[in-house]
Amino acid sequence: MPPPAPGARLRLLAAAALAGLAVISRGLLSQSLEFSSPADNYTVCEGDNATLSCFIDEHVTRVAWLNRSNILYAGNDRWTSDPRVRLLINTPEEFSILITQVGLGDEGLYTCSFQTRHQPYTTQVYLIVHVPARIVNISSPVAVNEGGNVNLLCLAVGRPEPTVTWRQLRDGFTSEGEILEISDIQRGQAGEYECVTHNGVNSAPDSRRVLVTVNYPPTITDVTSARTALGRAALLRCEAMAVPPADFQWYKDDRLLSSGSAEGLKVQTERTRSMLLFANVSARHYGNYTCRAANRLGASSASMRLLRPGSLENSAPRPPGPLTLLSALSWLWWRM
């Protein structure tokens, strides 16, 4: 049988609950028999209101609501000092109290005890307080070098006991439990990880995210050489992936280059790439160039060329086809 909805009235039929005996005399209650049947359960969410109602089908001379052994109300007389507990109804047919803003401390056994003309009766209800799941502690953002280990922690509380799930937002990888262990982490595992907790009390789960940064040395992923005529503009490009981002340097024949009118070139660097710009190519600009990308974990270099149009340097040779013998010999010489 499902528990009543939060704030619902729990109808306790006293005449059908001959499970114990109590005597109220001038506000004093002493229990004289043990209860032979279990109490009904009444479930509410933390922060909701709970109405406890005792419906009576006999003439009653005395009636009281108790929490454990503490009297809350005896008839119209208030015994509790808790301002959240108040009397709702006290008639010959019904005796009801209201508990507002229910908290975990309100959970427990409640007893409606009343005296009829013939004998005393009691009936009981066990108030269960559910608490929505919420995250109380989660790991701070993590930065680790590639190949290292990462432990992410997510602590959640709630009643019933909540479930905790870790999820990597990039690829949807999931792991159950408060602790997520990642061994030998790789750059592809960097990104945001989300902790989600839920216990069914509220429709919306609680979630928080942690950013995991994986540091690794630069890897040059692309370079662009150029063939440009004298007097024209040219561009050499170098792209590199690295965390932290790489610092780029350009060299010509082992000489470090910098932007300036004397060199006739400009270095323009963005986050993952650097470009060497020539506004007006002169003969001294032709030759070999080296791009170097470095961060605190390492460095990587790649070479490229600025060539004169028509130059055979760095051009990919073609295999001999239906050509003259001289052409074939020239091709073989180039391969040697």
Curated annotation (Swiss-Prot):
Signal peptide (residue range): 1-30
Main location group: secreted
Keyword Secreted: yes
Keyword entries, A-Z: Disulfide bond, Glycoprotein, Immunoglobulin domain, Repeat, Secreted, Signal
Subcellular location: Secreted
Pfam families from the UniProt entry: Ig_3, V-set
Entry GO CC: extracellular region
Glycosylation sites: N41, N49, N67, N137, N288
Xref: SUPFAM superfamilies: Immunoglobulin
Disulphide bridges, residue numbers: C54-C112, C154-C195, C238-C291
InterPro entries per UniProt: Ig-like_dom, Ig-like_dom_sf, Ig-like_fold, Ig_sub, Ig_sub2, Ig_V-set, IgLON_domain
Domain Ig-like C2-type as annotated: residue spans: 33-122, 132-213, 218-307
Repeat keyword on record: yes
BP GO terms, sorted: motor behavior; neuromuscular process controlling balance
UniProt record similarity statement: Belongs to the immunoglobulin superfamily. IgLON family.
UniProt protein name: IgLON family member 5
Source organism: Mus musculus (Mouse)
